[in-house]
């Protein structure tokens, strides 16, 4: 137990040696410390606010001028957009009159439907249904 006490004492001595030594002037200056008085600072801030309020009134008139300029610019931009629109008449040769668009091919939809029905009847059973069932049977 005496050894533990000796180790603790050595540790304390080492810790204090690592600390910065306290100078006499820092320890006790002989004066009482007081909190800083911010009243003077508050008065200066109040004066600055009053001056900025006066300058702000002048800045507001500048802001009104810039708003008017922005509105004029928007009107001009709208006029330019209207001028850019090409409102030419639609050429009648570009209108497709006969049903669906087929890229120049003429397709008989009734005949195509009949051919698809014939192919479906010839195949008999739907192959997709069998493939879907095979996936769940544990194959694959």
From Swiss-Prot:
Keywords associated with the record: Chaperone, Nucleus
A GO molecular-function annotation: histone binding
Cross-referenced Pfam families: CHZ
Biased composition (Basic and acidic residues): 1-28, 37-51
Region (Disordered) residue spans: 1-73, 118-140
GO cellular component: a single term: nucleus
GO biological process: one example: chromatin remodeling
Record's compositionally biased regions (Acidic residues): 61-72, 125-140
Superkingdom of the organism of origin: Eukaryota
Record localization: Nucleus
Main location: nucleus
InterPro entries for the chain: Histone_chaperone_domain_CHZ
Role of this protein: Forms a chaperone-bound H2A.Z-H2B complex that acts as a source for SWR1 complex-dependent H2A to H2A.Z histone replacement in chromatin.
Self-association state and partner proteins as the record states: Forms a heterotrimer with H2A.Z-H2B, stabilizing the association of the histone dimer. Also, with a lower affinity, forms a heterotrimer with H2A-H2B.
Family of this protein: Belongs to the CHZ1 family.
Name of the protein in its database record: Histone H2A.Z-specific chaperone CHZ1
High-level lineage: Eukaryota, Fungi, Dikarya, Ascomycota, Saccharomycotina
Gene transcribed to yield this protein: CHZ1
